[in-house]
């Protein structure tokens, strides 16, 4: 397979310091926008109206300049432009798979929340009836799941809510998903039908170890006056941070996905080391108690198919037994290889037999079609260049 790569800016530009640059308002919550307006002296009596105007232009219209905001007074636009921008984070690379999947490597400049440059990957997966954006919630990951490429990258920091939301703004910019605006690269479509219909927190990081920012991000993503994504089309995937599950359900109303991958603790301890802290029985009880779980809002259990490891008929039957009483569907994921891994994907016939056992027991058990494998954009393949970036920064500091 081949893929095309768009280099937005030279990688060497990573060493520039953007900490002193004007702050961007793109990605802020309503409270954040209101605080910015107060900074430039906007009257408190106008705060609600002015915040609503900014919200509409940033999130509904995708404005890239304050000059685009035609119903905002020229005086206010000038004041905003003197202090702030609507700039997006830097796109280091964009890769387009032969199947249409796109992967962006995004660089975040230092900010008030963090003095570190950082990079993450996010992925857009177009399909016939939907378009799914897979977003990252952390730079690197603490969980070291043995089958996951991200797990080989050291944890650097949490992403802010603004940085999470910026991933969607960038995607909508690039593919032309804001009404009336052409794609930034000329390759997308702005025909009027929404291109990003679903958001999945299945990129880099464990969302529940960054829950406050994930909660704020979901509130912006689902706001009906802006990005307007249904909470039923927002899925948060977790390896099983059991104490945080009730809070996730109560504060977001998002759909839940569990990275299960094994039906016995001794194996899951290896595949998902977090299991040593929160074993399968505790995790599944938390799922039974998850706020809002029902046949209409089923919990998705993700199960990566590893050859000779977790793919036997007895594993399938045990999975069915474990999930009894939980409104669930099982997403079977053919393992996606990455450089240095020792795992292999189960054979197609083995996956089909596993799926049949689960399906015949009454559970939906779709086999996920791998997308973006040729650009390392498929499930479990994401890993940013942040480690190299940190090394370059240290070299520059020593010069």
UniProtKB/Swiss-Prot annotation:
Main location: cytoplasm
Keyword tRNA processing tagged: yes
Chain ranges of the Radical SAM core domain: 127-376
Regions crossing the membrane: none
Cofactor: [4Fe-4S] cluster
Residue sites binding S-adenosyl-L-methionine per the record: 205-206, 237, 259-261, 336
GO CC term, one of those recorded: cytoplasm
Cofactor note text: Binds 1 [4Fe-4S] cluster. The cluster is coordinated with 3 cysteines and an exchangeable S-adenosyl-L-methionine.
SUPFAM superfamilies linked: Radical SAM enzymes (SSF102114)
Gene3D superfamilies reported in the protein's UniProt record: 1.10.150.530, Aldolase class I
Catalytic reaction equation(s): adenosine(2503) in 23S rRNA + 2 reduced [2Fe-2S]-[ferredoxin] + 2 S-adenosyl-L-methionine = 2-methyladenosine(2503) in 23S rRNA + 5'-deoxyadenosine + L-methionine + 2 oxidized [2Fe-2S]-[ferredoxin] + S-adenosyl-L-homocysteine; adenosine(37) in tRNA + 2 reduced [2Fe-2S]-[ferredoxin] + 2 S-adenosyl-L-methionine = 2-methyladenosine(37) in tRNA + 5'-deoxyadenosine + L-methionine + 2 oxidized [2Fe-2S]-[ferredoxin] + S-adenosyl-L-homocysteine
InterPro entries linked: Aldolase_TIM, Methyltransferase_A, RlmN_N, RNA_MTrfase_RlmN, rRNA_lsu_MTrfase_RlmN/Cfr, rSAM
Keywords assigned: 4Fe-4S, Cytoplasm, Disulfide bond, Iron, Iron-sulfur, Metal-binding, Methyltransferase, rRNA processing, S-adenosyl-L-methionine, Transferase, tRNA processing
Disulfide bonds: 134-379
Family label: Belongs to the radical SAM superfamily. RlmN family.
Protein name: Dual-specificity RNA methyltransferase RlmN
Native species: Methylocella silvestris (strain DSM 15510 / CIP 108128 / LMG 27833 / NCIMB 13906 / BL2)
